[in-house]
């Protein structure tokens, strides 16, 4: 059963995400629902207008977000310690705004995603009301989707951002967070945050 869950939750979503890579490399206008304050520490992120601890226990997920009910239904046999699944994170209109990895960090088998922790978030753009928008997704000091290479270098001076490449991928560390920034024309169009 666990083997089947692994194929369904991990391999299939990863395959589907790979098909989207070429179509996502576009700079869209930022969606208006944005977090208004500045994050000053390295253990929080903000997605849309919601500030969240990261890594984030699923039980603390803001009411503005949810995952499909089937992930709860499919876990009745349990997920072992250390195992994980990946899925879309939906807003209150059931629109996918991010993609997450949910991990069982307990030492025992759990039967509900609410007993697990979000250890990875990646976001780029989403469609709402027939328009495509960049997802407001930021870490400390306002760095996130829509940030320029120059803004990133001010906060992460060691970031190795190529000067003349139209597309680049840069990894930086921020406390317990590992950040992957994908640039198009030296602007962040996609960001992933994972925990060690």
Question: What is the role of each PLM region?
Answer:
Residues 11-162, 174-176, 184-196:
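Short helix/turn-capping signatures at newly exposed starts of structured segments
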Residues 166-174:
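Extracytosolic low-complexity repeat regions of secreted or lipid-anchored proteins
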Residues 1-10:
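Hydrophobic membrane-insertion alpha-helices, especially the h-region
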